UniProtKB/Swiss-Prot annotation:
Name listed for the protein in its UniProt record: 3-methyl-2-oxobutanoate hydroxymethyltransferase
Keywords: Cytoplasm, Magnesium, Metal-binding, Pantothenate biosynthesis, Transferase
GO cellular component, one term: cytoplasm
Function comment: Catalyzes the reversible reaction in which hydroxymethyl group from 5,10-methylenetetrahydrofolate is transferred onto alpha-ketoisovalerate to form ketopantoate.
Length: 275
C-alpha cells in the first residue's frame, strides 16, 4: 500500500520514526522502494550527485520532472516528493502553484518540497489551496548557499535558533504536512519537533526528529572524496562498483569474458554454408 501524507502524520502520532532517502532514477527507486522506505525525495541534489554541478542552483524544472517521472515509475509503496528547484517558486505565487502542479500532473509525484521559512509561507498556502501537499525545508537550505556563504550549520546562536523555531510554526500554519530540518544542532531540532504537530525529517539534525533522510550516494559510500559529518556509511557500493569494473576490464583484455556459457549458438551446418 502506498505511503501518503496521512501515513507520515500517523507515524509521528505513534512515535514511530519516518524513513526517507533520495532517488533519481527508475532502477534505484525500485530497489529503495522494495526495501520498505516510507518516502523518496527526488532532490535537486541530483544537480551535484547526478549531473556534476557545484551546487543545486543550475537544476531546472525539466531536469526535475524528467527524474521524478522515472522515480515514480519505479515505486509502488513510497510517497514520492518532488523537489522544487531554484527559481521555480521564488518568482511569484502563480509560478509556485503552476510548477508544483507540473510535478503532480506531469511527473506523477505525490507532494512537493520547497525551501525557506516565513518568506515562502504564502507560496505554500497557495500550493496547498490547489490540493498539492507541501513539505517544507528549513535550516541549511542549499538554494541559499550564496547567502549563507557556503554549506554551514544553521541555528547555533539565539537569534537564528529562535527564527528557525518560528519558521517551523509558520510553515505548519501555512499547511505544510512535514518539514525537513537540515544541518541544525540536535537539541534545537528537538525543540522544533516538540513545538509543532507535523513531522520533522532530519538530515544532519540529530536523533530527535520524527524521521531521517539521506542522499543515497552518501549513505552507500558511492563517492570517497567527500562525506558530510552527519552521514553514516551503510555500505560501500562505490568500492564494489570500482572493483567490478576493474575485473570486467581485466577479463575483456585477457579474453576471459565472454565465456562459452555467455554466447548464443548456431548450428554448424548453417555456419558451414556461410564460408
Amino acid at each position: 500500500m502506498r505511503n501518503t501524507v496521512s501515513t507520515f502524520q500517523e507515524l509521528k502520532n505513534k512515535g514511530e520514526k519516518i524513513t526517507m532517502l533520495t532517488a533519481y532514477d527508475y532502477s534505484m527507486a525500485k530497489l529503495i522502494d522494495s526495501s520498505g522506505i516510507n518516502g523518496i525525495l527526488v532532490g535537486d541534489s541530483l544537480g551535484m550527485v547526478c549531473l556534476g554541478y557545484e551546487n543545486t542552483l543550475s537544476v531546472t524544472m525539466e531536469d526535475m520532472l524528467h527524474h521524478t517521472k522515472a522515480v515514480v515509475r519505479g515505486t509502488s509503496n513510497a510517497l514520492v516528493v518532488g523537489d522544487m528547484p531554484f527559481m521555480s517558486y521564488q518568482t511569484s505565487i502563480y509560478d509556485a502553484v503552476y510548477n508544483a502542479g507540473r510535478f503532480i500532473k506531469e511527473a506523477g509525484a505525490h507532494a512537493v518540497k520547497l525551501e525557506g521559512g516565513a518568506t515562502v509561507a504564502e507560496e505554500i498556502k497557495a500550493i496547498v489551496k490547489a490540493q498539492i501537499p507541501v513539505m517544507g525545508h528549513i535550516g541549511l537550505t542549499p538554494q541559499s548557499v550564496n547567502m549563507f556563504g557556503g554549506f554551514k550549520v544553521q541555528g547555533k546562536n539565539e537569534k537564528v535558533a529562535k527564527k528557525l523555531i518560528e519558521d517551523a510554526k509558520i510553515l505548519e500554519e501555512a499547511g505544510a504536512f512535514a518539514i525537513v530540518l537540515e544541518c541544525i544542532p540536535e537539541k534545537l531540532s528537538k525543540i522544533i519537533s516538540e513545538s509543532i504537530s507535523i513531522p520533522t525529517i532530519g538530515i544532519g539534525a540529530g536523533k530527535y526528529c520524527d524521521g531521517q533522510i539521506l542522499v543515497y550516494q552518501d549513505m552507500l559510500s558511492m563517492f570517497s572524496d567527500f562525506k558530510p559529518k552527519f552521514v553514516k556509511s551503510f555500505g560501500s557500493i562505490g568500492e564494489s562498483i570500482k572493483d567490478g569494473v576493474s575485473q570486467y576490464i581485466k577479463e575483456v583484455k585477457e579474453a576471459k569474458f565472454p565465456e562459452e556459457k555467455h554466447a548464443f549458438k548456431i548450428d554448424d551446418d548453417v555456419i558451414n554454408k556461410l564460408y
